[in-house]
A protein has these predicted regions:
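ASCE RecA-like P-loop NTPase motor cores
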Residues: 1-147
Length: 147
């Protein structure tokens, strides 16, 4: 079976249509339960392809988020972003992962500068880290002219 065929089955399902309606009505919080394996990825992918809004998908842990990110990237090709946490260990702030810091900055930059819609996949630990606001960053920047 191809991905398109499976996606069409999920698009036609009553549960997916109800979820699409709740998103169309601008309901702020939506909880999806009972989906196992890649079925969540197919449902989110079908909603993302029909919807003109960005989606923030918050999952339980890093492994689950990476699993669904991989699925969604294969199903949607573009505009799927992964937002990781920057620390390797929760309480060792000096032990940061530079590649994750770069990924986080790239995701935030794309969201702030591009008008495109995005499907951002993350997990709760990544959302708890503070991020500097654009206004605060503006106060900390210095510009030099070199002649």
């Amino acid at each position: 079976m191809s991905n398109k065929y499976i996606s069409q089955l999920f698009v036609k399902s009553l549960q997916t249509q109800k979820l699409e309606n709740s998103i169309a009505k601008n309901e702020k919080n939506t909880l999806v339960k009972g989906l196992i394996g890649s079925s969540l990825s197919f449902v989110i992918s079908s909603i993302f392809s029909k919807n003109q809004k960005s989606i923030l998908l918050i999952l339980e842990n890093k492994e689950t988020a990476a699993y669904h990110f991989n699925d969604l990237e294969k199903l949607n090709n573009d505009n799927v972003l992964f937002y990781p946490e920057s620390y390797k260990n929760p309480y060792a702030t000096s032990n940061t992962d530079n590649s994750n810091i770069l990924l986080r900055a790239d995701v935030l930059n794309k969201i702030n500068t591009n008008p495109n819609r995005y499907l951002v996949v993350t997990y709760y630990k990544a959302l708890f880290e503070k991020v500097i606001t654009k206004t605060s960053l503006g106060f900390c920047l210095f510009f030099f002219n070199i002649n």
